[in-house]
Amino acid sequence: VEAAYLRRLGCIACPEHGPRHMKAGISMRQLSELRRRVDRLNQQYQGKLTVLMGLESNLISLEGELDVPEAYREYFDILLMGFHLSARPTTLSECWMFQIANPWAEQRYSERYRQKATEAYLRAIEKNRFDILVHPGLHWPLEYQKIAEACQAYGVAMEISARPKHLIFNENQTRQMAETGVQFVIDSDGHKPEEIGRVQSAIDFAER
């Protein structure tokens, strides 16, 4: 937050990882305290910087389930959704699909896995309320056109990340997705203070 203020940003979103992320997931029991911390920061920086409490929820099943129950939605100013290899799936069979077979299939661009992954994303978009789809295609090959059409229909924006390894689709695919009318969000995807607000590479990509 201090880095955002020093860079004269008007607003910063601070999304934690969802609870099933095995490396960095936040417990639902921590939400009340986190909400209070964000509210205090907004008082501290009032008129200078707006701090949004967010969560990067995890896609955890082929049926499109997320690891954030709808009842907790009120805690967040902004909710993101993405797929992470470190997120714990709901069943053992999905563990095989999500964490073992699919990363291998990604390298071969298996059509079967592309279809399954796309269907899981489409179900997630249709069944859940969230604001931004983050790093689509990371670890899972996707049919981007179908994803973009669903995002446009349900009012979900797609991320263009300044973090190179999180920007999976290419310029031509981006142009095709833009034709659906879907909105894009450019962000730094910063994990360190020095990365906050560094979005020029994502802007350059979008302008091409």
PLM feature segments, named:
Residues 17, 182-197:
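Short acidic/histidine-rich active-site segments
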Residues 155-168:
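His/Asp/Glu-enriched short active-site or ligand-binding loop at hydrolase and phosphoryl-transfer sites
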Residues 1-4, 16, 51, 79, ...:
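Divalent metal-coordination and catalytic microenvironments
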Residues 22-153:
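Extended substrate/RNA-proximal surfaces in nucleic-acid metabolism proteins
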Residues 1-21, 27-30:
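Phosphate-binding active sites in nucleotide-utilizing proteins
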Residues 24-25, 142-151, 167-180, 193-207:
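Histidine/acidic-residue-rich catalytic or RNA/ligand-binding cores of hydrolases
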Residues 5, 72, 125-126, 178, ...:
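Non-catalytic positions within long, well-ordered alpha-helices that form the structural scaffold/packing
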